């Protein structure tokens, strides 16, 4: 109930509401708008740096996972979204949870929001800023008594599944791509060597042997282009 913090929240939510009304945003889109704002603040962490007040995070335009998650929690709870801080003690990481209808994080009633970078609501952090990944179960710290939930969990789950599938396909194709790259490099080297030989023949006036190599050169180039277009 610090007046300085409340003034900040009123100022920010006032601007967000103007955007919501002018763009005709749904409640889910409004949550995503506020989330994107907090994610856009520069990530910065300092050794032995105590948690900032939300007003400090906004004025500095930066903060670590604790600072940004607490700022987002304050904003969303004041806009009637049911939220909780997700504190990962083992990994020294904090994120935000928002009550949702789908795509819930582990065994919680919240979907995950990563505040340290741009990501969709519901998609957990991959590799943490300091390295490693989230393995432990979070300590859940509810904020406020709001009731509104996020209802686009199924959509973000579909986005996440599509992304994971594309990553898997890329991984499966990687050996084939490397093999093709090696084959093309070998063919390019043969063409380069032949062109060097042909230049030598031309320079020495050996036109007959030069002409004999033209069809060979053209065949190598044709094969290279065919492989390249596959």
Language model segments and positions:
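A structural boundary/capping signal
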Residues: 1-230
């Amino acid at each position: 109930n610090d007046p300085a913090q409340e003034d900040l929240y009123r100022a920010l939510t006032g601007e967000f509401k103007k955007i919501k009304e002018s763009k005709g945003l749904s409640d889910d889109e409004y949550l995503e708008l506020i989330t994107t704002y907090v994610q856009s603040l520069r990530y910065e962490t300092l050794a032995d740096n105590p948690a900032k007040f939300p007003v400090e995070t906004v004025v500095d335009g930066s903060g670590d996972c604790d600072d940004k998650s607490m700022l987002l929690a304050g904003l969303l709870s004041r806009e009637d979204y049911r939220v909780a801080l997700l504190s990962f003690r083992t990994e020294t990481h904090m994120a935000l949870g928002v009550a949702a209808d789908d795509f819930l994080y582990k065994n919680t009633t919240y979907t995950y929001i990563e505040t340290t970078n741009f990501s969709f609501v519901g998609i957990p952090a991959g590799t943490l800023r300091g390295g490693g990944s989230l393995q432990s179960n979070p300590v859940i710290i509810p904020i406020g008594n709001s009731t509104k939930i996020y209802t686009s969990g199924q959509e973000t789950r579909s986005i996440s599944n599509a992304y994971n599938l594309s990553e898997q396909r890329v991984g499966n194709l990687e050996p084939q791509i490397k093999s093709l790259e090696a084959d093309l490099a070998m063919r390019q080297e043969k063409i380069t060597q032949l062109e060097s030989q042909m230049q030598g023949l031309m320079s020495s006036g050996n036109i007959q042997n030069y002409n004999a190599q033209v069809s060979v050169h053209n065949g190598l180039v044709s094969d290279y282009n065919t492989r390249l277009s596959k």
